[in-house]
């Protein structure tokens, strides 16, 4: 019998690279939208692992998919293909515009592949001078050196030496700035169809349409980073489907695996031809375990009743936040769509989003922040009404403790 080593939060500071600052409690069990720590304390989960746990913790369809595949085949590499990867790729083409799929292990890797494809396509078709990538301030696209540079937040990208070049950042939702800058040198515009880390900022209908039209005018590719917005999060399987425009390349991850690491880049057959054998790859991309779980997730999330349920739950959250605001006058506005929501703090509470997060944790509720002024909610897409009501009761107590 194996004797497990006793683990406490202090061990983190002894053995881990200090680029995270985790909570003091250590979760050991999860079920639905509840988790329990080492001491048996229960928490309602409104964070969902930062928009990852789309079916909650330990959902039966995911557990069954993982355990069944674990008894068959774990890994091959891409010297061979495998059945779960092919089935998942087929499903992703059925629920999106895409005709071709590249599998990776994370959102950052999916975005890296998207950017490399955009540059490769432009160089092949128009020449090496067509290399500019336009992205938006306060965007977030991952932590590789390329993707963190394209993300428009200097706090994440500064301090690592010379950055990859030919990347321009413009204000989000600013049509005039984009019109003034985009040119025939632009190979791609990369954007989140709803900015997540930047504060849950939705695009205006006019802006999203203008981006598509300007990309077409200048033969630039439109790349949508749907790492956070995808897989049912906004009430559509992918957010672009509710915006009236279609990207040329789309990245997806986070809730694609429901908690099992996987990412994917989706694109057209025409563009995919430019990543020939050997031009890109991933040892773990398309891993049978990851793809088996993701296939189960996509099947469950793409059901009409699941997507409709997201819209219903959005209303429950908005009603709960409105009641709290009526009581405490804390929020300036509620932003977002589906179950990617941000409660922007008003002037009186400015800069206190983390205070709310910490207070909520003490009451047994997990929430997120999106900058210093926005409390972010990205719960399971199938969270129950009872769990939501319990969570808001805890959030009420948390805010009361701060007044």
Swiss-Prot record:
Pathway: Amino-acid biosynthesis; L-arginine biosynthesis; N(2)-acetyl-L-ornithine from L-glutamate: step 4/4
GO terms under cellular component: cytoplasm
A Pfam family reported for this protein in Swiss-Prot or TrEMBL: Aminotran_3
Gene Ontology BP, a term: L-arginine biosynthetic process
Record EC number: 2.6.1.11
Keyword annotations: Amino-acid biosynthesis, Aminotransferase, Arginine biosynthesis, Cytoplasm, Pyridoxal phosphate, Transferase
NCBIfam families: arg_catab_astC, argD, PRK01278.1, PRK05093.1, PRK12381.1
Protein name: Acetylornithine aminotransferase
Annotated gene: argD
């Amino acid at each position: 019998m194996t004797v497990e080593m006793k683990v406490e939060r202090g061990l983190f500071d002894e053995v881990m690279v200090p680029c995270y600052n985790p909570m003091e409690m250590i979760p050991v069990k999860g079920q639905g939208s509840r988790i329990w720590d080492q001491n048996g304390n229960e928490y309602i989960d409104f964070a969902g692992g930062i928009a990852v746990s789309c079916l909650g913790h330990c959902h039966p369809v995911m557990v069954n998919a993982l355990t069944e595949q674990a008894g068959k085949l774990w890994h091959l590499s891409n010297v061979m293909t495998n059945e779960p990867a092919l089935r998942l790729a087929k499903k992703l083409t059925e629920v999106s515009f895409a005709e071709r799929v590249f599998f990776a292990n994370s959102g950052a890797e999916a975005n890296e592949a998207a950017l490399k494809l955009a540059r490769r396509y432009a160089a092949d078709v128009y020449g090496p001078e067509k290399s500019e990538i336009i992205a938006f301030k306060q965007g977030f696209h991952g932590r590789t050196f390329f993707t963190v540079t394209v993300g428009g937040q200097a706090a994440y990208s500064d301090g690592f030496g010379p950055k990859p070049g030919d990347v321009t950042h413009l204000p989000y939702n600013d049509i005039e700035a984009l019109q003034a800058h985009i040119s025939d040198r632009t190979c791609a515009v990369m954007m989140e169809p709803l900015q997540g880390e930047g504060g849950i900022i939705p695009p205006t209908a006019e802006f999203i349409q203008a981006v598509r039209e300007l990309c077409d005018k200048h033969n630039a590719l439109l790349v949508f980073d749907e790492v956070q917005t995808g897989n049912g999060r906004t009430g559509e399987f992918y957010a672009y489907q509710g915006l009236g425009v279609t990207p040329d390349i789309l990245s997806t991850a986070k809730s694609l695996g429901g908690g099992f690491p996987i990412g994917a880049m989706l694109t057209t057959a025409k563009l995919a031809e430019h990543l020939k054998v050997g031009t890109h790859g991933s040892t773990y991309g398309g891993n049978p375990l990851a793809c088996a779980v993701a296939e189960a997730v996509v099947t469950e999330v793409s059901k009409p009743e699941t997507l409709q349920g997201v819209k219903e739950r959005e209303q429950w959250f908005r009603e709960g936040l409105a009641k709290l605001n009526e009581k405490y006058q804390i929020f300036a506005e509620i932003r977002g769509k589906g179950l990617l929501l941000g409660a922007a703090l008003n002037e009186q509470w400015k800069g206190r989003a983390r205070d709310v997060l910490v207070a909520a944790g003490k009451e047994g509720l997990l929430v997120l922040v999106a900058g210093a002024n926005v409390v972010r909610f990205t719960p399971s897409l199938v969270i129950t009404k009872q769990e939501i009501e319990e969570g808001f009761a805890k959030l009420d107590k948390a805010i009361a403790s701060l007044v």
